[in-house]
Structures are given as structure tokens and as C-alpha cells.
A protein has these predicted regions:
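C-terminal segment of classical bacterial N-terminal signal peptides
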Residues: 1-5
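Flexible, processing/modification-adjacent segments and terminal tails
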Residues: 7-27, 33-36, 64-134, 193-195
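Envelope-exposed proteins and targeting segments
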Residues: 26-28, 41, 50, 57-59, ...
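An N-terminal domain-cap segment
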Residues: 32-45
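An acidic-aromatic
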Residues: 42-91, 154-161
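Short, charged low-complexity intrinsically disordered segments located at boundaries
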Residues: 43-53, 97-99, 168-170, 194-195
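Gly/Pro-enriched, hydrophobic low-complexity segments
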Residues: 104-187, 192-194
């Protein structure tokens, strides 16, 4: 008899399954910690399709799929823009859901520790020097295909920003209005239209 060996899925298959799992889960709320060269921060992101509400220390960002509003508490100012997919990469840690299908070379790597049994390590290297994110490393839980951690290196930088997923709640029923800036909630804020 021939011993059966479990086939290791390839990087694209892992990311396809992770993206599919994310889309099936409806509204998602994630809390996270970021360790970056410019400092550490904590935050949360609520996602529904391509919409998100990102809250970090001092900054709240709404994105309705087209328009983005970023509120800076320190200046009581809201910047309004229509970001390109490239600009969204540096704002939304979940932009990899659409990025991996183009302009990135994918591979599965060993995690180098005991988590090899519980997580896939997928390395995404940009194929174009113009890509804002030159390298993204995703640790994806086997079974659920949920991201556990991601590491990102931007163009022109040697240092990675590492995002640790602290909690991942699914099945949230978010109204589309959650992803749009509510002027009434910030009556004194100055709007700066960058469109």
C-alpha cells in the first residue's frame, strides 16, 4: 500500500479560501495591535464587503466603498478623499483580500516554529516596484482560514509593521450608514475635501 500524505495547499488556494471564508462571514469586527517602526497602537476594524470603519488611537476612518473620511481627534479635522486601491493598502489591513490576485508572487513558507501545525505562512512579494506594499506575510489559521497575524513592508522601508489579530467576531449585521461619516456626531469638525 502507498502511504497517504496530506497535500499541502498552494499559496493562492490558501488565500482564495481565506477570502472566501471572510466574505461568507458577513459583517466582521476585528480588534488588533500594531507594532510598527513609528510606534505601537491598538484598534478595531469593522468590515462588510469592501466597506470598513477603522478606529485607532486618535483617528477614525470610514470607507463606504468609494469615499473615505478620516477624522483626526487632535485637530478636530476630517479629510475627505476617494482613495485609489494602492492608497487603501496602507489604510485597510484587509486590502490583501483583493491584492493577492494580481501584482504579487505568492508562496507558502515554513513558520519556523510549532505553529506550523496550526497556521499557514503565506508570503506575498510585489512584482511591480511601484506597489506601495512590497511584501506582505500572512499567518492564516488552518481549518478556519482566518488571519492570525500579518506583517507588511512598504516601498522604501526595511522595517515591517506587524498586525496581531486579538479578536475576530463574525456574523455582525452592519447597516451601510456605519461606514459613512456622520456630520451630526462631529459638529465642530472642519471638513477638508481632498477629492
Amino acid at each position: 500500500t502507498i502511504p497517504m500524505v496530506a497535500q499541502q495547499p498552494d499559496a493562492r488556494d490558501i488565500l482564495d479560501r481565506a477570502a472566501d471564508a471572510f466574505r461568507r462571514e458577513g459583517g466582521v469586527k476585528i480588534t488588533f495591535s500594531v507594532r510598527a517602526p513609528e510606534g505601537n497602537t491598538n484598534g478595531s476594524i469593522r468590515l462588510k464587503g469592501d466597506k470598513f470603519l477603522l478606529e485607532t488611537e486618535g483617528v477614525t476612518t470610514w470607507f463606504d466603498g468609494r469615499t473615505q473620511w478620516s477624522y483626526l481627534a487632535s485637530s478636530d479635522e476630517v479629510n475627505v478623499s476617494e482613495p485609489t486601491p494602492e492608497e487603501l493598502q496602507s489604510i485597510n489591513p484587509y486590502s490583501w483580500l483583493s491584492l493577492y490576485k494580481q501584482d504579487y508572487k505568492l508562496k507558502v513558507a515554513k513558520t519556523g516554529n510549532a505553529s506550523d501545525d496550526t497556521a499557514y505562512k503565506v508570503v506575498m512579494n510585489a512584482t511591480k516596484r511601484s506597489q506601495d506594499m512590497q511584501c506582505i506575510i500572512l499567518y492564516i489559521e488552518k481549518g478556519s482560514f482566518r488571519p492570525l497575524k500579518l506583517s507588511m513592508v512598504q516601498r522604501g522601508s526595511k522595517d515591517a509593521a506587524v498586525v496581531f489579530i486579538n479578536s475576530y467576531q463574525t456574523g455582525k449585521n452592519y447597516d451601510d450608514s456605519l461606514f459613512v461619516f456622520d456630520r451630526k456626531a462631529y459638529p465642530t469638525a472642519e471638513l477638508v475635501d481632498l477629492r
